[in-house]
Amino acid sequence: MKFVLLFGVLLVTLFSHSSAEMLDDFDQADEDELLSLIEKEEARAEECTPRFYDCSHDRHSCCRSELFKDVCTCFYPEGGDNEVCTCQQPKHLKYMEKAADKAKKFGGKIKKWFG
């Protein structure tokens, strides 16, 4: 048991040391590059396709919801030969977002009770 504890402490120490070295290696050029990428991401976010709108022109242009990006889903309507593509949120991601919202609200209540 003592060996496991000693090994765990050693592992945590090495991990924190490597994390500190990685932070030291993050120089000004990397910061400028990161800022330019963030600016491009913000600019791209303004041009996204809202949910339930046509995304056939660019299938990767769907907007993000609170946690996940919507997906361009294509289908053929009944009795039609034309393919229709719209930005939609898959059901499993929708349920995950609802669960995350409920967990946030519950966490806030716990904070009020004990905080």
Swiss-Prot record:
Record carries keyword Transmembrane helix: no
Predominant place of localization: secreted
GO cellular component: extracellular region
Compartment(s): Secreted
Cleavable signal peptide: 1-20
Similarity comment: Belongs to the neurotoxin 19 (CSTX) family. 01 subfamily.
Alphabetized Pfam families for the sequence: Toxin_35 (PF10530)
Protein keywords: Disulfide bond, Knottin, Secreted, Signal, Toxin
Cystines in this chain: 48-63, 55-72, 62-87, 74-85
Notes on the domains: The presence of a 'disulfide through disulfide knot' structurally defines this protein as a knottin.
Organism of provenance: Lycosa singoriensis (Wolf spider)
Record lineage: Eukaryota, Metazoa, Ecdysozoa, Arthropoda, Chelicerata
InterPro entries hit by this protein: Spider_toxin_CSTX_knottin (IPR019553), Spider_toxin_CSTX_Knottin_CS (IPR011142)
Tissues where the protein occurs: Expressed by the venom gland.
Name the record gives this protein: U3-lycotoxin-Ls1v
Classification via PROSITE patterns: SPIDER_CSTX
Origin: domain of life: Eukaryota
GO molecular function annotation: toxin activity
Propiece residue ranges: 21-44
